[in-house]
């Protein structure tokens, strides 16, 4: 079996820095370990006041880095129960313990830009160590007072058509990307980071909560290659780390974001992937601490833990924290208690559909299930709302007709329904879009589309201006002008093929179906 210290994401050296980052231990806070059960450590103190809840403890270990733990319960007048934030290999009863006199404090400011940090703010990349005098902030902090908070009613344009049209994000608000495994949540979050840097020149703070080490490494390399790392802070608590580390990573990211909001008056994009792993880590911690589980095995404090995290994500006068959260939906069950608890706090719900991903409709965002409180005429304008409602109505009606089409064929529909089906399919394809972050894999340049161009394109499709276009001309394009050029090129290619066939004396065996953009035998109909 691999050494636990060797398998930890940042290694023994990083853990050593972790322990030193919480400050010097106070002499009166000396104690000793009396029990160790996995990540749970019971500590007895000989005299004086016990360490407060959430206070950090350091435990030296012979031949290894000190262990950092956090107090979570007072067992008696002389004993506390703490949760280790790192591997407990090598720890034994009787080991000395020091209380630090306060919660974990993490580095903030310009020094952390472009860096990858652990839950305690220790560098986990190949960069230089942080200066000893770098400013630090505690990870535990209350939300701003209600009188200081600013409502989120300004549009946060992303350049992603389907989001901007049907589930617009609020600057200073909270949005969540809900989806099962493999439907594109992380790619969508990466594209939003790219959009933030390109459009707003703001600060991005990324919290990697319980995700794969490989994905974290790839994200670091991608950001270096794209040039956005210099205005980004990465905070990782990966899936191979103890539950305490994964549980506290969002708080570390929040502390850094709050510094740039409060002290620098800078807009911050806070991205968290994956918030479900935060809930999952909390369930592990709850079990380790001996609490009885609630529904589906979740911790009894699920609602309060999610609320404590989400309520700290707030905007104040002069600066906004815009949160975009990826949320894994276990078994695609949107009634899961963790999913419903998170959904109650967000302004915009972006729902990713496995069925759309299977059809290649990327981003695989469900236009019917996604929603936003910003889709209001007073915020985005009447024209935007009218087009969004009509797009949703047409696609929803098409879905209602799909069973009839599958059983009886499209010919059994009336003329109006056939026309609606064609427009719905074209709308679905127009709402697909190539991403800048996938350009290296697809070979197609990413497209960022203004909201006005998205509305104009959807209105033209709804009006019937594109009824005789190939569906393929609208697939993976930016604006309608891009689709128009694609359609013109396809028609020119068809004309050349027909001319060549006529010159060679070939018969009219096949024709290119203008609706689908594919060659089909004469008499075949689109929509089978």
From Swiss-Prot:
Cross-referenced Pfam families: ATP-synt_ab (PF00006), ATP-synt_ab_N (PF02874), ATP-synt_VA_C (PF22919)
List every stretch annotated Disordered: 1-27, 488-528
Q: Which residues bind ATP?
A: 179-186
This protein's record includes keyword Transcription: no
Q: What GO CC terms are in its UniProt record?
A: plasma membrane; proton-transporting ATP synthase complex
- Compositionally biased, Polar residues: which spans? 1-10
Which reaction is the catalytic activity of this chain? ATP + H2O + 4 H(+)(in) = ADP + phosphate + 5 H(+)(out)
Source organism, top-level taxon: Bacteria
Biased-composition ranges, Basic and acidic residues, are: 15-27, 488-499
Q: Where in the cell is it found?
A: Cell inner membrane
Please name the InterPro entries in this protein's record.
Answer: AAA+_ATPase, ATP-synt_VA_C, ATP_synth_F1_bsu, ATPase_a/bsu_AS, ATPase_alpha/beta_chains, ATPase_F1/V1/A1_a/bsu_N, ATPase_F1/V1/A1_a/bsu_N_sf, ATPase_F1/V1/A1_a/bsu_nucl-bd
Q: Where are the transmembrane segments?
A: none
Entry coiled-coil feature ranges = none
Broad class of the protein's primary localization: membrane
Family matches, as NCBIfam families: atpD
Question: Which protein family is it in?
Answer: Belongs to the ATPase alpha/beta chains family.
According to the record's subunit comment, the protein's assembly and interactions are: F-type ATPases have 2 components, CF(1) - the catalytic core - and CF(0) - the membrane proton channel. CF(1) has five subunits: alpha(3), beta(3), gamma(1), delta(1), epsilon(1). CF(0) has three main subunits: a(1), b(2) and c(9-12). The alpha and beta chains form an alternating ring which encloses part of the gamma chain. CF(1) is attached to CF(0) by a central stalk formed by the gamma and epsilon chains, while a peripheral stalk is formed by the delta and b chains.
- Give the protein name, as stated in the record: ATP synthase subunit beta 2
What organism is the protein native to? Burkholderia pseudomallei (strain 1106a)
What gene name is listed for this protein? atpD2
């Amino acid at each position: 079996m691999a050494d636990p210290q060797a398998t930890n994401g940042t290694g023994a050296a990083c853990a050593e820095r972790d322990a030193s980052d919480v400050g010097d231990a106070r002499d009166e806070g000396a104690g000793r370990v009396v029990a160790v059960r996995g990540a749970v450590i019971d500590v007895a103190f000989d005299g004086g006041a016990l360490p407060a809840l959430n206070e950090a403890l350091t435990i030296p270990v012979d031949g290894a880095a000190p262990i950092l733990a956090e107090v979570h319960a007072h067992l008696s007048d002389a004993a506390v129960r703490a949760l280790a934030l790192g591997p407990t290999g090598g720890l034994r009863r009787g080991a000395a313990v020091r209380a630090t006199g306060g919660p974990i404090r993490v580095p903030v400011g310009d020094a952390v830009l472009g860096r990858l940090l652990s839950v305690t703010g220790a560098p986990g990349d190949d960069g230089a160590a942080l200066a000893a005098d770098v400013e630090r902030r505690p990870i535990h902090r209350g939300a701003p007072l209600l009188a200081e908070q600013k409502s989120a009613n300004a549009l946060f344009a992303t350049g992603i058509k389907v989001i901007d049209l049907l589930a617009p994000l609020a600057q200073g608000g909270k949005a969540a990307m809900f989806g099962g495994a493999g439907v594109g949540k992380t790619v969508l979050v990466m594209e939003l980071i790219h959009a933030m840097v390109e459009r707003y020149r703001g600060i991005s703070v990324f919290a990697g909560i319980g995700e794969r080490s490989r994905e974290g490494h790839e994200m670091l390399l991608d950001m270096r290659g794209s040039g956005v790392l210099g205005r980004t802070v990465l905070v990782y608590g990966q899936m191979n780390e103890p539950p305490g580390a994964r549980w506290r990573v969002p708080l570390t990211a929040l502390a850094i974001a709050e510094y740039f909001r409060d002290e620098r008056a800078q807009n911050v994009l806070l991205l968290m992937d994956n918030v479900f792993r935060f809930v999952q880590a909390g369930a592990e911690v709850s079990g380790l601490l001996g609490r009885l589980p609630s529904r589906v095995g979740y911790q009894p404090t699920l609602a309060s833990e999610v609320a404590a995290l989400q309520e700290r994500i707030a905007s104040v006068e002069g600066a906004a924290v815009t949160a975009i959260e990826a949320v894994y939906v276990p078994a695609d069950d949107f009634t899961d208690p963790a999913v419903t608890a998170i959904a109650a706090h967000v302004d915009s719900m972006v729902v990713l559909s496995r069925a759309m991903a299977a059809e290649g409709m990327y981003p695989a965002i469900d236009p019917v299930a996604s929603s936003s409180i910003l889709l209001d005429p007073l915020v985005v304008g009447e024209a935007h709302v009218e087009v969004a409602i009509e797009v949703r109505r047409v696609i929803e009606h098409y879905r209602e007709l799909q069973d009839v089409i599958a059983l009886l064929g499209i010919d059994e529909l009336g003329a109006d329904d056939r026309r609606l089906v064609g427009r719905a399919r074209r709308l679905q394809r127009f709402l697909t879009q190539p991403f800048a972050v996938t350009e290296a894999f697809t070979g197609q340049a990413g497209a960022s589309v203004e909201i006005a161009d998205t509305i104009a394109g959807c209105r033209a499709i709804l009006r019937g201006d594109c009824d005789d276009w190939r569906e393929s001309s609208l697939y993976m394009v930016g604006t309608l002008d891009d689709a128009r050029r694609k359609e013109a090129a396809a028609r020119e290619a068809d004309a050349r093929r027909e001319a060549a066939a006529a010159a060679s004396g070939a018969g009219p065996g096949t024709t290119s179906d203008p609706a689908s953009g594919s060659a089909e035998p004469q008499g075949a109909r689109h929509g089978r």
